[in-house]
Amino acid sequence: MNCRKYLLSGLAVFGLAATSAVAALSTDDYVEAAWMTTRFFGAQRSGQGPNWILDGTSNPTSFTKDSYNGKDVSGGWFDCGDHVMYGQSQGYASYVLALAYAEFTEVSTTFILVTTPTTRKPTTTPMKSGKPNKVRDLLEELRYEADFWVKAAIDGNNFVTVKGDGNADHQKWVTAGAMSKLGSGEGGEPRCITGNANDGFTSGLAAAMLAVMARVDPDTANQAKYLKAAKTAYSYAKSHKGVTNSQGFYESSWWDGRWEDGPFLAELELYRTTGENSYKTAAIDRYDNLKFSLGEGTHFMYSNVVPLSAVMAEAVFEETPHGMRKEAIGVLDLIYEEKAKDKIFQNPNGMGSGKFPVRVPSGGAFLYALSDKFNNTNEHMEMIEKNVSYLLGDNGSKKSYVVGFSKNGANAPSRPHHRGYYANEKRWRRSRRCSESSRKEQALGRYDCWRLY
């Protein structure tokens, strides 16, 4: 495969690529778009950091006192734009990112440059404004998250899946550093920690991520540390079922019984890393428990990892166990190609506000790219390029879905749903007069329903 294939496929996990329709974009433009997206994870850092989006504020660190049964469990990533850690989605995100790094190594290690930003705003910070530290940006982000999973995987009976309370977290619209100094009722420290939920999904995906890191991290000490933690997290996953229920934020019912993909993918990755057949045997035994009939009905996302399981099973087993399932590409076609409009992947409900989550085209592009990589083909490159370039502004409204990316006349997001972006450290509270319509606007980044406390 050529360098272009690696670049476009690797960027698919971020939702970034190019088509002939946006041919004016250079390779450097694609690299910068990927760098911008990688920075999002750096802005999600909890704990000691550094978190670049908090640089220059009065509170550059946050939630450094997180502990469970006396053990330090600080660090990791926040949920998108908020300050609670929900492992239900974080396990999914961390494994997918690690898998992208592992499988599309050329783009991960050649095109993602290493910089430590010196200014805060993503719309004004050029990629080369920072100082190289000789560690690839993406690897550095993965290490930050993996080091948290090492802490979270305490033993076979204790695994941290949630840090914080969503309702308390939404009381103030301030930076993570400012919020951590508020009382518990306003999302600050000390925070409630969930460390013994009946959850095999989150711990399973954390184990899968750690197993990948044990394989790809160039540091031998890290390899040993991550493999040990992967086995601990897997031990927890084997003895627990279901998904942590976070009422109103990540409800276990959203998974509709699709939790065994977590330990299944852990078994596959532990087998790939260690070569021990016991993990492969366990994965084969678990394969029939995966909810393919339910997973083929909706797109790839944190609550439906079935499509990824199909791709990975075919890659590891060469042919699926017992010959019972169709080939992985058939699963993907059912979810994506057959529901596409003008080759753009989307929800069955179509386009429009609330009906076009970015995860649909980016997730579909990533899965097709991954399948093509394992099968050594370029068969789906046109679809991959079409969908990911849509997110860079190659669409009817010239709308870019990447904060700060406005190349070729694309309209970048101007009000991202991310509290750190606004660097507000004052005490804001939700107005009682905040109507349902203004709440929807607030979710889009128009903060009319918040006022100074």
Swiss-Prot record:
Q: Which Gene3D superfamilies match?
A: 1.50.10.10
Record's catalysed reaction(s): Endohydrolysis of (1->4)-beta-D-glucosidic linkages in cellulose, lichenin and cereal beta-D-glucans
Q: Which residues form the active site?
A: 82, 417
Q: What EC numbers are recorded for this enzyme?
A: 3.2.1.4
Q: Does the keyword Signal apply?
A: yes
The domain of life is: Bacteria
Explain how this protein's activity depends on temperature.
Answer: Optimum temperature is 37-39 degrees Celsius.
Tell me where it resides: Periplasm
Q: Record keywords: Hydrolase included?
A: yes
Q: Name one Pfam family in it.
A: Glyco_hydro_9
Q: Where is the signal peptide?
A: 1-26
Q: Principal place where this protein is found?
A: periplasm
Which one GO biological process term can you cite for this protein? cellulose catabolic process
- What keywords appear on the UniProt entry? Carbohydrate metabolism, Cellulose degradation, Glycosidase, Hydrolase, Periplasm, Polysaccharide degradation, Signal
pH dependence remark: Optimum pH is 5.0.
State a single Gene Ontology molecular function. cellulase activity
Linker ('hinge') (Pro-Thr box): annotated segments: 115-126
Q: Give the record's GO CC terms.
A: periplasmic space
Reported function = High levels of endoglucanase activity detected on acid-swollen cellulose, ball-milled cellulose, and carboxymethyl cellulose; moderate levels detected on filter paper, phosphoric acid-swollen cellulose, lichenan, and xylan.
Family the entry assigns: Belongs to the glycosyl hydrolase 9 (cellulase E) family.
Assembly with partners or alone = Monomer.
What name does UniProt use for this protein? Endoglucanase A
In the UniProt record, what gene is named as encoding this protein?
A: endA
